[in-house]
Amino acid sequence: KNETIILINRKLSLIKMSKVVLVMSHLSCADDSKSKLNKKQLLKFKKIKSHFPESLHSLSNSAGILLGKNYHFDMVRPGISLYGGHCKKNEKKIYHQVVSLKAKLIQVRNINKGDTIGYGATYKAKMNMKIGTLGFGYADGFNRLFSNNFQIKLKDKKIDIVGRVSMDLVTIDLTKIKISNSIMKQEFEIIGNKYSINVISKMINTIPYEILTNLGKRYERRYIS
């Protein structure tokens, strides 16, 4: 704001007596490269920057980095892009997939034609089916909007979610999957190469940030370098 620049000018002598290590600001509309506010903020930041020639200067987050070198200054602050998340509207795929989410079965059972699955009986079996239950749910950040509306991967096979996503459980259709003794130990992929945080966020009209930050504390986290 202009008031900030005026205040800095008034306090300039006091500021010069102090050692300011870093001057930092944040772009409000960096995710929209066509927004006029980006250039407006850039110009104001440069005015403030001129009063701190010996300090480091930082303006850009992930989206700001993609606006070009004029926005970079001494350091940038990538956030969502470190996790492979898109940070701009209509952004092309330029990052590698980083985050994956996997779960294991806790139960497999047979149901008969006409049986219903889950709260609200939103899915009715059209045939005799084999149903698997995975140990995660909306309490772990998996949105209820994916009820009857998502596919989970087991290696190269796509498996439908059937029934409503509940607090702690998700049910899937294993009818066409060959069941072996090892299936209870196998990992089913929820977030990964097929459904990245970018794809998932578009499916429920939100942003990758929300998908990522909603992942609950009950998941075991593995950091692989």
Predicted stretch roles:
Residues 1-104, 108-112:
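Active-site loop/helix belt of alpha/beta enzymes
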Residues 110-225:
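C-terminal accessory subdomain/extension
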